[in-house]
Amino acid sequence: MVIDSKQDLPQYTKDSGSESDSDSSNNFIVESPSIPSSKSATVVLNSEEYEDDEGDDLNGLDAELIDNITYEGDEDETMFVGLKEKQKLHLSGVFRLQVVKGGIVYNNVHYNASREILTFWHPLSQSIPTIDFSHFAGWQDTFFMPRNNRFKIRDEEFKSFPCVLRVFNSNHTGLLEAGHLYRDVNYLWKPKEPYFPLNERTTYHLLHESDRIQSLSVPGYWSTPLEKLYLSHKNAAYDTRIMVIGGKNSGKSTFLRLLLEKFTQDIRDSTTSQEELVYLDLDPGQPEYSLPDSISLNKILSSPISLGQHLCQGSNFQTLLQFYAGSSSPQDEPTSYLNCADKLIDHLEEQAFFGTSLLNLPGWIKGFGMQILNHIIRKYKPTHLLFLETANSKRHLDELTIPQSFSTSLRDAYAPEVVRVPAHSLNHTLSSRFHASQLRTFKILALFHKITQFDYDFAPLLKSAPLQISYGKGKSGIKGIQFPMEFQDLNPQDIKSALEGTVIGIYTYSGEDSLEVKSLNTFPILQSCTSSSKNFITLGLIHSIDTSQQIMNIYVPPCHTQILDKQPEDAQWIIVRNKTETPFCDFLPSPRTITWDDNIQIPFATFERRKKLEHVWKVRKNVMRRGQFMKR
């Protein structure tokens, strides 16, 4: 969607304290491009060609975009968009973008025209950030047109546009096909009935006001704390520790994402390589970088440039340490959760880290959740503590206990800077479209169907063969099975059914002492095992168990098989059964997603509909109703 903005960029929503966006962020008008302002800066335009290994009709685009868009329709579904002053663009999906001429502003960060390729992730479960027009920030504007595109497009076509963008398909193949297996996310990346229909191969979509999308509007009262935190990151002599606290749907993840995008762009522009950025992802229910139901410590990479909400599918981070929490909320096993969080923070301390770290927490701020927050504050020792307040959460946040000063191995006593900012719910109109449980299922499916870093195959797992792993005494495979505390007294006859069709955590044991296990119906049940002696590897999905041969059939994410292969041959394997939800669409796929061999006879099952007058006769028990008495 190309629209004309009524305000100069960057644009903020002036919110009066409510959690809704202003009208200007929800009402989009698609208009023909206006004539550039006479006050626009005069720039000298150089033309620079370069080779591009990525691979003029409009294909039915609306007439109101003809002057702005040139659609090539090549193998990458390339589209060139020209923007004039005060115009902006809305796109959904996963796509790559190059600023060919001028510049753009995205989430209040400026990006100049260059050869750099930006990868954008815009799911419709989130508010869609706008790609705003901007001029080239420099002395001499340059036209970075790939040579293979220059043969098809004349310079005169975009001469009147101060900003030109090249939008083309993502290099992630198969990701948008998750809806074929899990229908709830069929329209996660694209509108159900797009106003501007493009080729089916496109991984992005132009958005229109009729698509009922919500624009990401950054409120004005967020701009000041964002700018202050950026200056603290840029000018800090020691490490900077930023912690954001708030209730559910208060905008914690969005606020941290805005900070990250600003910090990473600053690191790319910096002449030194000493600045580092790490992210403590402690929200197992809605993680930004962790595996499903896990918490982790991650190093953020400045390249490749990944913008937006990637739903844990991005490649701009490196996981330093990760623990499987086993559920979407810390309230299920708070002690285990805190132990894992402490180990992540201890690992950060051991690195003598001088850069900037950010910490994301779940929105549990009531009852025992407040004790968890107080514990992590004392452990993490933030330099900056930001509260995102609402009318309901303000009284809970007043119960926080914040020490007056902290001290670490890198610096002596320092006082944390505490800032209270009104929360801003950015996705309130979209809450009925995608629920958190649906997004969690999508992330689990994406994990088990991820072939390589960029390739996905959402064919049902039943069409592929699982790994066969032995278990039990005298076997070289799984040495121990761990259940949650409330299932320690599980009936031995129920262990098999409690494991089949469930998601498990796969660990290796590194303790010096031998594992303390108890054999129950051939299953080696762990009696005690400290978390410090377990190394989390990945998640698995148990297909079935053969108790006679003591073999488990387990699906492992294809992208993680190399991690398993790197483990030593004498590694002692442990699996942990917890409360992660199973994606049943993999085990019970719809008939249209899987075809059976005609030679396979499945008893008592049919995928054919009965004829109109065909009925199934069922024998009913005589319950001695009045009409069922036999006459004599």
UniProtKB/Swiss-Prot annotation:
Record's keyword terms, sorted: ATP-binding, Kinase, Nucleotide-binding, Nucleus, rRNA processing, Transferase
Pfam family for this entry, one: CLP1_P
Single GO cellular component term: Las1 complex
Sequence ranges of Polar residues compositional bias: 26-42
Phenotype when changing residue 252 to A: Abolishes kinase activity and termination by RNA polymerase I
GO terms of biological process kind: cleavage in ITS2 between 5.8S rRNA and LSU-rRNA of tricistronic rRNA transcript (SSU-rRNA, 5.8S rRNA, LSU-rRNA); rRNA processing; termination of RNA polymerase I transcription
EC number of the protein: 2.7.1.-
Amino acids binding ATP: 246-253
A GO MF term: ATP binding
Family: Belongs to the Clp1 family. NOL9/GRC3 subfamily.
Described function: Polynucleotide 5'-kinase involved in rRNA processing. Required for the efficient termination by RNA polymerase I and the processing of the IST2 pre-rRNA internal transcribed spacer localized between the 5.8S and 25S rRNAs. May act by maintaining the phosphorylated status of the downstream RNT1 cleavage product, which in turn allows the torpedo activity of RAT1 to efficiently terminate Pol I transcription. In vitro, displays polynucleotide kinase activity on both single- and double-stranded RNA and on single-stranded DNA alone, but not double-stranded DNA alone.
Domain of life assignment: Eukaryota
InterPro entries according to UniProt: Clp1/Grc3, CLP1_P, P-loop_NTPase
Induction: Cell cycle-regulated with a peak of transcription at the G1/S boundary.
Source organism of this protein record: Saccharomyces cerevisiae (strain ATCC 204508 / S288c) (Baker's yeast)
Intracellular or extracellular location(s): Nucleus, Nucleolus
Residue ranges of the region described as Disordered: 1-42
Primary location class: nucleus
Name under which the protein is recorded: Polynucleotide 5'-hydroxyl-kinase GRC3
